[in-house]
């Protein structure tokens, strides 16, 4: 039976959870924004985490953490397998990044976000917390137009042909990290333009699905768990992504094998990383090409959020006004 057309039950719950997800990211974004430019990324991350955790605990759901926070946050953690929500209602898996772009926010820079995704039980692939090679494009292209096994030149020429443009008109987004230095050189040699970001590869990937973002393709190495969040977003927004684990040493190889990833050359697509009915929400913490940042004035916080649902392919932009007294 089509979940979306079924009477009662799960489809209605999904719609309700979409708005609840936005409330969670709004709370985290407001808390983090208060520390913008303060130079303390740990404090900002802790504030976002605490606000997100508190908001999650108020949702009528039996939530299980798939991707959480494991760096302490003042002694509080949410690890895979931990429970969130009231314990009543639908069973869901939760993947969260309370503050993407910690270093950006600490410097007062643009494009910090609060992110949350929810899936049916078993909906998120459980990667180890290691590096992940990624490539992503927006909707409207032939399947497998880009591939991690293609050369940089082939990927960009294929995309340019699909777009009906020249390679030098394309914009490639990727993290400004030493691990991407060779890729950056290759992109420049092919002739495409580059948008380097300091942090937050989930937001970079999401931009490929937003026609007016100015980004045509995302490439490079980031985090594996962030790849799952990005896949959740693209499931609702449209687009293609491939990812592959990047193992740097024996310890990381052991982590991957322990979780069942025996073929380290395997490529994963969105539908494998985020399966079934998915809800994804993001709220801007600071201004960026995807979302406006939190604006606080006269005891009022104004937020700008995006929520998408994979089953309907619906994208909603929501502006929220939050009295702070």
Model-inferred region functions:
Residues 65-69, 94-96, 105-107, 126-127, ...:
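General beta-strand structural signal in soluble alpha/beta enzymes
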Residues 89-100, 104-123:
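DPxDG-like acidic metal-binding loop motif
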Residues 2-10, 17, 207-225, 229-325:
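Oxyanion/phosphate-interacting regions
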Residues 2-95, 157, 161, 202-203, ...:
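N-terminal subdomain of lithium-sensitive/metallo-dependent phosphomonoesterases centered on the IMPase/IPPase/PAP
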Residues 115, 120-196, 288-295, 299-325:
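Acidic beta-strand-loop-alpha-helix segment within the catalytic core
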Residues 176-180, 200-203, 221-227:
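Gly/Ser/Thr-rich loops at beta-strand to alpha-helix junctions
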Residues 57-58, 83-89, 97, 105-109, ...:
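Solvent-exposed alpha-helices and their adjacent loops that cap or buttress functional pockets
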